[in-house]
Design a protein with these regions (language model features):
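Hydrophobic alpha-helical
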Residues: 1-57
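Short, acidic/turn-prone active-site loops that include or flank metal/cofactor-
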Residues: 53-57, 74-79
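Generic structural signal for well-ordered, non-membrane alpha-helical segments
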Residues: 5-8, 76, 80
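Flexible loop/hinge segments that line or gate small-molecule binding clefts
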Residues: 56-68
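Hinge/cleft segment of the Venus flytrap/periplasmic-binding protein
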Residues: 78-113
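Alpha-helical scaffold segments in soluble metabolic enzymes
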Residues: 34-38, 62, 82, 86
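Short beta-strand elements at the ligand-binding edges of bilobed clamshell
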Residues: 65-77
Length: 113
């Protein structure tokens, strides 16, 4: 969906039309609002396991309502900090500096913060 909800909704609508046996959906990008809208209008949200990225207010509501089953969340502030550290190390020619891996959190309806 090119990280655009207006594109994502059309892609998911088509996917749902073409695959009546679909049991799972994974959205790696943005555009989760399009996924939500397409699933809710299709009346199939309870039949399809849905995993997306980034715990936004829309994703939170979709988890609570049961439209989404899991959200993989990364702390974007830490990601930006690590990216800046990596760029500084590159500019300083410090080939030994490696930022640590970014922690992932997986949220479901029962463990929302």
């Amino acid at each position: 969906g090119r990280d655009d909800s207006t594109v994502t909704i059309e892609v998911v609508r088509q996917l749902l039309r073409d695959h009546d046996d679909l049991i799972g959906l994974y959205n790696i990008g943005a555009g989760n609002r399009g996924v939500i809208e397409a699933l809710e209008e299709s009346q199939r949200k309870d039949d399809i396991a849905v995993v997306v990225h980034e715990l936004t207010r829309h994703a939170r509501r979709a988890l609570v309502s049961g439209t989404f089953d899991a959200v993989i969340n990364q702390n974007y502030k830490i990601e930006v900090d690590y990216a800046i550290q990596a760029l500084k190390a590159y500019v300083d020619s410090d080939v030994t500096a490696l930022p640590p891996p970014v922690q992932l959190d997986i949220y479901m309806r029962d463990n929302l913060p």
